[in-house]
Amino acid sequence: MPSPSGDPVVAAPQRLPAAGAAALLRISRLLTTRRITLHALLLAVCLWSVYAIDLATPGLRDRAGHIKGADFLHFYTAGDLVKNGRLQPLYNPPALAAYQQALVPQSTHTYFVASYGPQVYLPFSLLARLPYGWAALVWALLNCALYFGCCYALWRCCPRLQPYAGAVSLLALAFPGFFNLIAFGQTSGPALVLFTLAFLALRSRRNFLAGLAVGSLIYKPQLGLAAAVVFLLAAEWKIVAGALAAAAAQLSFAWGWFGSTVMKQYFHSLLRTSQALPFIEPKLYQMHCLRGFWLLLLPWRNIAGALYALTAVAVLAAAVLCWRSRASLRLRFAALLVASVLVAPHLIIYDLIILAPAFLFLGDWVLERTEAATVPGLRVFLYLGYALPLLEPLAKASHVQFSVLAFAVLFGWIRLATREGPSLGYRASPAAI
């Protein structure tokens, strides 16, 4: 991010060789407010105009022949099952596919596997009262409202970003995580809301409430894995207690509402996850986590799994150190979010929506700490982490997911930043929150 004048003002990094530090400094100086805003504008126009053209066809198939709403079709089908009290097909893939094709005849040759708890599908029983096209539109608009509402609430917590409302709005609109959330019709929007609520609660020193938000991620547990480990190892007992209470309440509600039979079917389906991976993860180049990185890079699944475990443990250990540091809450929370993306065992591009707070907090931090040695690295890899998820075709061809490399290096720069001492704002240490 640039200085308020639009030109970067930074110190050369002291932990890199001279050539590397100079290169980072030169690149970071190119990232002025004007350039970043222009790039965001061009990206937003390209993404959303192409998407609009793709959808501008009669019927429920887009120009590429895919069902409009993409994954929303699965939630719509499951919601209709819940609405009609017909839950037996939910965790039976052949029966679910047959019901889906009867419900939406144009969805032939599109298949899904139910991998969520039944409580996730309950709200979709309301949308299932609408025709499929209208229901998909309502869900997209709801995701837009959740996303921009969270961005606005978090932007209000970033004083150095206040003069850049236009640039921030364009960056939010063009964010690849948001674009793919809408394009896929997925359910990662509520996860962003929960992380936002957790941050706001921590900022107000209400740890138990923060834990309630984190524990509610049990509906999409892979996104809460890093938070669970970090808060447990950092001995944040109020947060842990809140998380356990929220997770238990959500599962208890599901058990009470849907009954033992459905819950047993759900847990049995979780045990069969390895058999369903070809359906859940058909395109490894769409995954933006360490596990996806190693599986895409290496043809040997056992070795890839071992390397994922090793690198995930390293990231989690560093995340705990970040959280226990005396750095600002926004910097530590950004580290937690990037770690959450890296260590998640299953993370598709639309799940990157949870990084929106991290981009805001880190952008605000580099504007505040313009003389910090880590600013050039943070600025450059913030830019790369924002843009590289769009290069999935390159990942498919090269078998290297460059976004994960960018996230890993960005996480390393955040770790270095947490060791530079507390910043001017949000000085509270973990013990004080």
PLM feature segments, named:
Residues 220, 301, 325-329, 391-399:
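Generic structural signal for short, solvent-exposed loop/turn connectors between secondary structure elements
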Residues 147, 217-219, 223, 227-229:
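Long, hydrophobic, well-ordered secondary-structure blocks that form the structural core
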Residues 172-173, 217, 224, 354, ...:
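Hydrophobic alpha-helical transmembrane segments of integral membrane proteins
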Residues 2-209, 231-356, 360-368, 423-433:
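Primarily membrane-embedded glycan-assembly and transfer machineries that use lipid-linked glycans
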Residues 210-216:
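Transmembrane beta-strand segments that form the barrel wall of outer-membrane beta-barrel proteins
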Residues 363-433:
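Aromatic-enriched
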Residues 219-222, 248-253, 377-378:
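Membrane-embedded alpha-helical segments of transport systems
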